[in-house]
Amino acid sequence: MTAQNTFDVIVIGGGISGLSAAKLLKEKGLSPVVLEARDRVGGRTFTVQNEQTKYVDLGGAYVGPTQNRILRLAKECGVKTIKVNEEERLVHYVKGKSYPFKGSFPPMWNPFALMDYNNLWRKMDEMGSEIPREAPWKAPHAEEWDKMTMKQLFDKICWTSSARRFATLFVNVNVTSEPHEVSALWFLWYVKQCGGTMRIFSTTNGGQERKFLGGSSQISECMAKELGERVKMESPVYKIDQTGDMVEVETLNKETYKAKYVIVATPPGLNLKMHFNPELPPLRNQLIHRVPMGSVIKCIVYYRENFWRKKGYCGTMVIEEEEAPIGLTLDDTKPDGTVPAIMGFILARKCRKLCGLTKEERKKRICEIYSRVLGSEEALHPVHYEEKNWCEEEYSGGCYTAYFPPGILTQYGKVLREPVGRLYFAGTETATEWSGYMEGAVQAGERAAREVMYEMGRIPQSQIWQTEPESVEVPALPFVTTFWERNLPSVGGFINFLAASVLSVATAAGMLAYQKGLLTRS
């Protein structure tokens, strides 16, 4: 289409998902336009460049094996990946003490805690295996699990306080919310569609294995450059009107665009900023009121030298202390060893609690906990500090992703990506693989673009959903479990076994005593 402001498809949102959709449409000979509310592309990815940091990812940054779509895009853009350092030991900080370790999860020396931890991960993966990626509301136990919070599930399956405490951190780290806030069905689905508990939490061979050299915003900027003037910045969408032959979209700056189809590539809750004519269907209208965003402040502390590596630590800290602002850290030093830095997340309840502090106060508290965990005075003397509070972002509403409270997924989940007339829905929340990550954003954007192409008669329906070949540069390795990890009983199972054993021994002893005449009938 050549008329001014008239296109084949309007894409709302210039993050990775929206740009992926527009890129694919353009490659297939269609005419898309991208309307982005901010003065930049990238959405929940945000790379800042300055003298102190060279560059720093204040938003989405991590990528790993099985995230093949975002890796393909990066390769097309000439963006290389670098491994997050995990050569030295990690540190688990609990009850005021630091415990160095190697591997994905901290080891447990208490046998009851070990059984409890092992059963927790095994149980979550077992439950997740029942949940269909494409339709979690169709799981055999969907209704039961959706009425339950993750806190209720943890209370049900965990016997020890240490397992419950770490399980809470596991939810905080992965979805920036609290166990009492999220549906068990939704969280179990979320972990499953990321490849399971090991894949989602691990650095090496997991979701945090790598970053993009030069920052993740390069990928959005590369796609935007390819689209050229089709990307309109500072164009928040105010109104979507489907009543005419063409869909009309109006922005806050009073620009009007027309197209045959529209792809909405924003977090679901941001649909509330748009006025729809005709009104959205009842379930879609209620869905967008019911899926809040997670809460996180991403913090990067810079130091004169990499003192933690000199002490034999890689920079990863798993911190279990209520007063500590940070729950998880990763090394953020540049691959050539320059600009030594530690990245940490202020998560969920702690994010909400510490939002009221000044930036300087947050930095001070972060440095203090790093000093205690690493046992180093040097941690108290940073040379620079960067942070990004995603809760204050008007056009994100939070990070990393939207979460589903109890009861929502089974009642409203089926309309999450269901088209409304000529409106189609993208955004990482609508993905079925690595939802919440950059990978999910690409899958969702390209799927929505293919839905439009199918509706236009350009592709068969069978081509809407497509698998992605594995990345050659970043292959996925299987996680190998030991015999004991597969067969170690839960605490409850062990207690039942002991009780049954004691009962059996007592019964056998009684029978023997009776046979020998040691017991007589009265």
Curated annotation (Swiss-Prot):
Site entry (Important for catalytic activity), positions: C158, C367, H384
| Subcellular localization | Mitochondrion outer membrane
Intrachain S-S bonds: none
Q: Which residues cross the membrane?
A: 493-513
Q: Which superkingdom does the taxonomy of this entry point to?
A: Eukaryota
Chain ranges sitting on the Mitochondrial intermembrane side read 514-522
Q: Which reactions does this protein catalyse? A: a secondary aliphatic amine + O2 + H2O = a primary amine + an aldehyde + H2O2
Membrane topology annotation: Single-pass type IV membrane protein
Sites bearing S-8alpha-FAD cysteine, chain numbering: C399
The keyword Phosphoprotein appears for this protein:
no
- Stated EC number for the protein is 1.4.3.4
Matching InterPro entries, A to Z?
Answer: Amino_oxidase, FAD/NAD-bd_sf, Flavin_amine_oxidase, Flavin_MAO
Q: Name one GO cellular component term.
A: mitochondrial outer membrane
Q: Which residue ranges are assigned to the Cytoplasmic compartment in the record's topology?
A: 1-492
Which PANTHER family does this chain map to?
AMINE OXIDASE, AMINE OXIDASE [FLAVIN-CONTAINING] A
Its biological purpose is as follows: Catalyzes the oxidative deamination of biogenic and xenobiotic amines and has important functions in the metabolism of neuroactive and vasoactive amines in the central nervous system and peripheral tissues. Oxidizes both 5-hydroxytryptamine (5-HT) and beta-phenylethylamine (PEA).
Q: What is this protein called?
A: Amine oxidase [flavin-containing]
Q: Which organism is it from?
A: Oncorhynchus mykiss (Rainbow trout)
Lineage here is:
Eukaryota, Metazoa, Chordata, Craniata, Vertebrata
